[in-house]
Amino acid sequence: MFAVIKTGGKQYRVAANDVITVATLEGEAGAAVTFGDVLLFTDGDATQVGTPLLSGIGVTGEIVQHGRTRKVIAFKKRRRQNSRRRRGHRQDFTVVRITEISAGGKTSKAEPRKTRKAEPAAESAPAAAE
């Protein structure tokens, strides 16, 4: 089950438990966010395409973190005139984990993440030199 959502002027294909990076969203880390602009939805059997949007389908996510990208340098130089301009820009972004896609009576929820515990390595005794 997946959906295509629109946020920040871009489109993203999302499924439950996906992690996507989008333009800045309001809210603190851990807050829930709902995406209302759903363009396409499929549950494996049938596909619904909006004209342009679908109604009755909800995509819910959780804000993981906010951040900024690497600095992009814009450098202008006019030759032989000792004229230079150096300007930098860093774009803000938000990382979101999709928790649920719901359509009518069908729901696709993200399963809890399984974390592996580091198993202690079997300690081998040093070989005795005889």
UniProtKB/Swiss-Prot annotation:
<comment type="subunit">
    <text>Part of the 50S ribosomal subunit. Contacts protein L20.</text>
</comment>
<feature type="compositionally biased region" description="Low complexity">
    <location>
        <begin position="121"/>
        <end position="130"/>
    </location>
</feature>
<dbReference type="GO" id="GO:0005840">
    <property type="term" value="C:ribosome"/>
</dbReference>
<keyword id="KW-0699">rRNA-binding</keyword>
<dbReference type="InterPro" id="IPR036164">
    <property type="entry name" value="bL21-like_sf"/>
</dbReference>
<dbReference type="GO" id="GO:0003735">
    <property type="term" value="F:structural constituent of ribosome"/>
</dbReference>
<dbReference type="InterPro" id="IPR001787">
    <property type="entry name" value="Ribosomal_bL21"/>
</dbReference>
<feature type="region of interest" description="Disordered">
    <location>
        <begin position="103"/>
        <end position="130"/>
    </location>
</feature>
<protein>
    <recommendedName>
        <fullName>Large ribosomal subunit protein bL21</fullName>
    </recommendedName>
</protein>
<dbReference type="InterPro" id="IPR028909">
    <property type="entry name" value="bL21-like"/>
</dbReference>
<dbReference type="GO" id="GO:0005737">
    <property type="term" value="C:cytoplasm"/>
</dbReference>
<keyword id="KW-0689">Ribosomal protein</keyword>
<dbReference type="GO" id="GO:1990904">
    <property type="term" value="C:ribonucleoprotein complex"/>
</dbReference>
<comment type="similarity">
    <text>Belongs to the bacterial ribosomal protein bL21 family.</text>
</comment>
<keyword id="KW-0687">Ribonucleoprotein</keyword>
<dbReference type="Pfam" id="PF00829">
    <property type="entry name" value="Ribosomal_L21p"/>
</dbReference>
<dbReference type="GO" id="GO:0019843">
    <property type="term" value="F:rRNA binding"/>
</dbReference>
<keyword id="KW-0694">RNA-binding</keyword>
<dbReference type="GO" id="GO:0006412">
    <property type="term" value="P:translation"/>
</dbReference>
<feature type="compositionally biased region" description="Basic and acidic residues">
    <location>
        <begin position="108"/>
        <end position="120"/>
    </location>
</feature>
<comment type="function">
    <text>This protein binds to 23S rRNA in the presence of protein L20.</text>
</comment>
